[in-house]
Amino acid sequence: DMFDKLVFVSHWQQQQFNTLLKIPYDRGVVIKNAIDPIPKHEETETKDLQLIYASTPQRGLDVLMDALDLIDRTDFHLHVFSSYKLYGWEQNDEAYKHLFEKCESDSRVTNHSTVSYDELRKHWTNMHILAYPCTWQETSCRVAMEAMSAHCAVVTSNWGALPETCGEFAYMYNYTEDKNKHVEIFADALEDVMDSYWTKDVQKNLDNALEYSHTHYGWDKRINQWIDFLDNLIYELDHGENSKKEIPFNKES
């Protein structure tokens, strides 16, 4: 045995390891990712909705930019934060140069490339919708967590662990491998949310999503889960695997 425990960031991820690699469930534990929730802030109704894409380009930026071609309206502005520079792999951006150029050529879009985390957090307080037509099997999704904590509507696919991360709060559609269909489906889903964003029902849903994110995805809760898990693991290693200290790690409340 090369490990005592595997820590997974979602139940979906643990299930994949069990199904594909036959890792027994009792050899793992789920401790989800965490964020520093965006501070609560006042939001007033505005004419133009502020949309955000904040991920590396291969995760769906192409679908998003093609979807904009189908959206014939100007009452929004998209802010794109996308580059491999964040990881020191600037050369990888070359393959997506055409997407960045498309961003630059659309007056409805601002390409911010890479900014500091503190600057991005400031931008979150001005955003309304996370436009994320995800084409990547996320094992978890911190940007969705941050979006919910910032009172943003999350428009995304049900690919990977996104349903688990977003709960019932995202405006989610069924993923498709057909890119052309994906573009059309996402454009429709995004416009539906844009049309209804300021309605009472949507605002109530965003209020609930914010509270959920602040409650379940903050570091205060996650640190305690890690401490409990490590205390349990150390005790088991010291006293044998059949000895378990009564520490309720991975608790959900």
Language-model-derived ranges and their functions:
Residues 2-19, 23-40:
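Donor nucleotide-sugar binding/catalytic pocket of nucleotide-sugar-dependent glycosyltransferases
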Residues 7, 43-60, 65-68, 78-79:
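Conserved donor-binding/catalytic core segment of Leloir-type glycosyltransferases
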Residues 153-156, 163:
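Short hydrophobic beta-strand element within catalytic cores of glycosyltransferases
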Residues 93-115:
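Nucleotide-activated donor-binding/catalytic signature segment of Leloir-type glycosyltransferases, i.e.
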Residues 177, 199-235:
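A charged, aromatic-enriched C-terminal amphipathic alpha-helix characteristic of glycosyltransferases
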Residues 77-96, 113:
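Glycosyltransferase donor-sugar binding loop
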